[in-house]
Amino acid sequence: MMIQDRLFPATGMPDRNWWHVLWPDPDGVIKALRIETGMTVVDLGCGYGYFTAAIARQVGPGRVIGFDLDPKMLEQAQTACEGMMNCNWLPGDAMELSCLLGARADYVLMANTFHGVPDKTALAREVAMALKPDGCFAVVNWHPLPREKTTVLDQPRGPSTGLRMPSEQTRAAVEPAGFKLEALVDLPPYHYGAIFRKTASHEKGEESAA
């Protein structure tokens, strides 16, 4: 069992072969999620770096931080992003992101992991503290389809049906942490991206607490 699976159930990285078939155009996914040139982006739970490399290409002079609990996954991600000078790597628990990150980010992406987080709103609060004012948090989730309907290479893939989150459920978990849903993006064939913007009221609350 991967380290990630022990804390966030059903979130371990899948076999590369079918993952690449499911996501043939990672660069297109990153563009659809409105990640822009020059941003500082955290790939939270980056695994072996499949989306990290695409983010690095998109942000150009910006920076991407691959963040994962499993050092072995980070080693694989570093290999996947070899030669990309705008990549940094940070091992740690996602629930300690803001403390470990130091400087705040423009954007945090969490792809295919949020469904397994035990306290989703607490994690979203941690992400909010790691973001600059007006920063974005994007959650990529499987559509709430029966698992037997989400096949890749003729096999059912993804988390169990009961773990899949409708976009309304994702919104209900994230918005109380100081975010507002900005956009829902369909990511065929089986995913959606929910892009949340950090609210000004949350930023003021952080300043008051400080």
Where are the regions that the model predicts?
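Class I SAM-dependent methyltransferase SAM/SAH-binding core
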Residues: V42, Y48-L97
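A short glycine-rich, Lys/Arg-flanked "PGG" loop and its adjoining helix->strand segment in the class I
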Residues: T121-C136
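A short SAM/SAH-binding and catalytic strip from SAM-dependent methyltransferases
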Residues: D106-K120
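C-terminal alpha-helical "lid/dimerization" subdomain adjacent to the S-adenosyl-L-methionine
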Residues: D5-R6, A10-H20, C136-I195
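C-terminal lobe and adjacent flexible extensions of AdoMet/dcAdoMet transferase-like proteins
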Residues: A194-A210
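Short glycine-centered segments of the SAM/dcSAM-binding site in methyltransferase folds
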Residues: T40, R63, D134-C136
